[in-house]
Amino acid sequence: MIRKLRIAVDHGNKNMKTCNQVFTTALITQDKKPARGEEYIFYEGKYYLLSNRRIPYQRDKTEDERFFVLTLFAIVKELKKYPQIAPEDVLQINLPIGLPPKHFADLCEKYECYFKGENKVHEIITEGGTYHVAIHDVMAFPQDYAAMMTVIDKLQDIPKS
């Protein structure tokens, strides 16, 4: 069965954030399966684990695969909230992402293409099961735009200098 879900991800320099999860932007890659009880994903022949040693600042997070893999971690963490997902389900993910307003004009299209990829189905094996994920649509927005819209009236009253 094809299931459509929207999972928003904020790719911070310190933390990855979803509606329900926050974790450090840190990743370990290894060839061997991790010890029992460790949270991991197995993707394209490699095991990935989260770490506390964060990735140094990257203005452009599309330079290598690390932030893509961290995004898969974020998606999987959110999918664990849906017990009705069956192993044979294909999950079409709409992925809203936030970009710093300062970088939005330069990186918006690049980020959308990077995270959408080739629109293929990614098989992600975790300690808890297997997911088949297709990142169907990616929409980049300036970070904090939605939060700002909730107080726009107050912002308009602030004197400009």
Q: Positions of the model-derived regions?
A:
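Nucleotide/phosphate-binding catalytic cleft detector across ATP-hydrolyzing
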Residues: 1-160
